[in-house]
C-alpha cells in the first residue's frame, strides 16, 4: 500500500489480486463488507447498509480495546469504478459525532489484466490539522490491515 498526505488530503492506493467487480462488491455488499472492513483482530457489525447514490451505512468496528461507530453517506456510486461518500465518526445511536472531523472519501477502482484491481482512496478533511489528527490515530496501519483482510477474502 502506498500512502501520502497532501495538505488536507490523505491518499492511499493498493492493488488487490481480484477482478474489479469482486472488489467493488466487497465495498457495496453488506455480507462481504462485514467480513473484511476492519483491522486484524477486529470485527465489523453493520446496523444499516445501503451503498447506493443517496444511501447510507451505519456500522461499528470492534477491536480488543475499543468500539468505534461510523456513518457513511453515499453521494455517488458508479459501478464498478467509483464510490464517493461522506465518512463521519458516529455515536452508538447512529448520529454524527460532531467532536470528530468528517471527511469526503473518493474511492476509484481500476482493473489490470482482469485479475488485479487498484483501489485508490482520497480522503479530504476540513483542515490540514484534521488530516494530521487521523494520521496520528494510526490510520495507515489500520487501513493496511483492513486491505490485507480484503485481499485474503477475495483470494
Predicted regions located by residue number:
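Generic C-terminal helix-cap and adjacent flexible tail
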Residues: 152-155
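Beta-strand/loop substructures that line and gate deep hydrophobic ligand-binding cavities in soluble
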Residues: 94-141
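Intrinsic-disorder/low-complexity, polar/charged segments enriched in Ser/Thr/Lys/Arg/Asp/Glu/Gln
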Residues: 7-13, 20, 44, 56, ...
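Hydrophobic-ligand binding "helix-grip"
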Residues: 34, 39, 47-50, 58, ...
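Alpha-helical scaffold segments that form or flank carboxylate-/histidine-based iron centers
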Residues: 15-19, 62, 134-138
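Hydrophobic pocket/interface hotspot
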Residues: 23-24, 33, 57, 74, ...
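Hydrophobic ligand-binding cavity/cleft-lining segments
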Residues: 1-44
Amino acid at each position: 500500500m502506498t500512502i501520502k498526505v497532501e495538505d488536507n488530503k490523505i491518499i492511499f492506493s493498493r492493488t488487490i489480486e481480484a477482478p474489479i467487480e469482486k472488489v467493488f462488491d466487497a465495498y457495496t455488499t453488506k455480507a462481504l463488507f462485514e467480513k473484511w472492513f476492519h483491522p486484524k483482530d477486529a470485527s465489523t457489525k453493520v446496523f444499516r447498509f445501503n451503498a447506493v447514490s443517496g444511501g447510507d451505512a451505519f456500522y461499528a468496528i470492534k477491536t480488543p480495546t475499543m468500539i468505534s461507530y461510523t456513518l457513511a453517506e453515499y453521494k455517488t456510486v458508479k459501478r464498478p469504478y467509483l464510490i464517493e461518500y461522506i465518512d463521519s465518526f458516529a455515536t452508538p445511536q447512529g448520529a454524527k459525532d460532531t467532536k470528530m472531523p468528517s471527511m469526503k472519501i473518493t474511492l476509484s477502482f481500476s482493473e489490470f489484466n482482469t485479475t488485479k484491481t487498484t483501489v485508490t482512496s482520497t480522503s479530504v478533511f476540513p483542515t490540514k490539522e484534521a488530516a494530521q489528527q487521523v494520521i496520528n490515530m494510526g490510520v495507515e496501519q489500520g487501513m493496511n490491515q483492513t486491505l490485507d483482510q480484503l485481499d485474503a477474502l477475495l483470494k
